[in-house]
Amino acid sequence: MKKLFVLLTALFTLTQVNAQEKNVIRIATDNTDLILQVAPNGRLYQAYLGDKLLNEKDINNFSPYVKGGSDGSVSTRGWEVYPGSGAEDYFEPAVAITHNDGNPSTILRYVSSEQKAVAGGTETVIQLKDDQYPVEVTLHYIAYPKENVIKTWSEIKHAEKKPVTIWRYASTMLYFSGNEYYLTEFSSDWAKEAQMSTQPLLFGKKVIDTKLGSRAAMHTHPFFELGFEQPAQETQGRAMLGTIGWTGNFQFTFEVDNVGNLRVIPAINPYASDYELKPNEVFTTPEFIFTFSNNGTGEASRNLHAWARNYQLKDGQGDRMTLLNNWENTYFKFDEKLLAELMKEAKHLGVDMFLLDDGWFGNKHPRNSDNAGLGDWEVMKSKLPGGIPALVKSAKEAGVKFGIWIEPEMINPKSELFEKHPDWAITLPNRETYYYRNQLVLDLSNPKVQDFVFGVVDNILTANPEVAFFKWDCNSPITNIYSPYLKNKQGQLYIDHVRGIYNVLERIKDKYPNVPMMLCSGGGARCDYEALKYFTEFWCSDNTDPIERLFIQWGFSQIFPAKAMDAHVTSWNKKTSVKFRTDVASMCKLGFDLGLKELNADEQTFCQNAVANWTRLKKVILDGDQYRLVSPYDGNHMSVMYAAPDKNKAVLYTYDIHPRFGEKLLPVKLQGLDAKKMYKVKEINL
């Protein structure tokens, strides 16, 4: 046995040496291998991306020259990992730079690589360099073995004498070879988020992008699914899920070339964003996160859910608070007495927190509608004379925590802030101003504006340290696209604006690491894994009609765990029962926008019991493995379940969306359980 062990060790060591000699870089999870190889020309190519290789020796059996074109030219290149522009490649580049001498070409050659342990996995860092210009690109890959997730991003820098212009800056580039590819995308609009549709990818380019800036994902979301040889299915077939962590303009390019190979290019959208990069300044691209499964999208989603809870989502291992929000109770019309009554209702309902929404601020220009007040973050004395301290006190007396709504990135022209600092708003200097929802976007590329936005949160928490939660809204895309701060560098606005937001959020996280925040953007128009480093959850949609929410939550659950998704019981579609509305909301992080006075005694008792049941089972719902059993896209029924990782407990939701006379009801096969165990089944929320 000892001899055999020595022999196996020797073979493994030899394999590692051979791999190094061939300049092979292996990026591996427990189920996936990404093999990169340096060719004799010094350039780095993708040699393999697929199932985990069972034999270590196989990593030496690949060639960087993998798929040639009909004229043979492509065969001299292969699938370059980070191809530049202006040379011999005929397709979309990963990076494009105009150098000081006007040359628009970039060719990167391999310099070095290293691997190091990081939380949950292994990071591979690869250095590339242009041999004609002092340009360097650093590729980063973090492989999370257990979750079968890979996260990748790139860094671009140069040492030319003057700034260069970069006009393509992909996070990465991935290649696939197959007979058929199918793309599932997630379109959106206000109250109609995460709508799934599937199409084949044929010759040419399919581009999904957004140009909206701040409310970036209002029309399309920053994630997708790929099905290989067939449309992506829930429980069978090979599927890939991908998402980019960028709270701004993003772009996915899917390009099928002349011999049927597919390139996937996730990136910041280069639209109106020729970026001036100073010498030795580092341009960091967004993270692209992806996972594979041979057992359909359900398993791939569970990969992402586990990864997010473990490593990406703010307080991913922590608890979540149920809440009562006043918005649909009061809109802008409230006072201290009414809010105190709602806090008592929150306690009676059994939730953890009362959340005060829009309409609490502004004095010279009071926020009694959406026409005024944004930017003036002082409590409205005429409405709330006791200020936030009085509200915190009332919440404490009622026995609930207190949270508050803010929209700190926005400004109304009717505000003291705009009167003092009109140059802080993104607006054109010589054209008629267009207002979206009567407001403008503050210019977060400006450090002074960043300080102001940070101060909105900091001032509230400094004066009121018992404020327990923020709902951070963003209701407008960027309009009137001009930054008074950037002046002649307008190509940097869309990018530096987002980076300014991250700077603010990083400062908040550093000073107040334990304060949970909800990400909201007129519904679900902000939903990415970079923002969720700073937010514990996001608001999926203003549409809380339970029928529509089944589709919306089904779509978002492809990428995000229930712990990150907020769902509230409201008065939308009052024709549906309170039970239906509550059951649908309890599939995610539960909240209420429904006043108890709207409910009869039986409905109030039902809601109290439902909150108690959700609280009792939230560990399974928020941290369990999700199994999507019956899709609402397939008919009149829908079913989802959550199973505890130890398989000792599960929660099952089933819905007959549009009951029909004499309809055929089919049994639902449960998943995530142990067939050898006996389970007690109990229906709840009756």
Enumerate the predicted regions with their spans.
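Active-site neighborhood of glycoside hydrolase catalytic domains
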Residues: 380-387, 393, 397, 419-579, ...
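Aromatic- and carboxylate-lined catalytic core of secreted/periplasmic carbohydrate-active enzymes
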Residues: 585-589, 593-630
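Bacterial Sec-dependent N-terminal signal peptides
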Residues: 1-22
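Polysaccharide-binding surfaces and accessory modules of carbohydrate-active proteins
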Residues: 21-35, 44-255, 271, 678-685
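Carbohydrate-binding surface patches
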Residues: 31, 224-226, 234, 631-674
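Aromatic-lined carbohydrate-binding/catalytic grooves of carbohydrate-active enzymes
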Residues: 315-455, 464, 469
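Conserved, mostly hydrophobic/aromatic
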Residues: 31, 154, 280, 324, ...
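Short Pro-Gly-centered flexible turn/kink motifs
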Residues: 103-110, 275-294
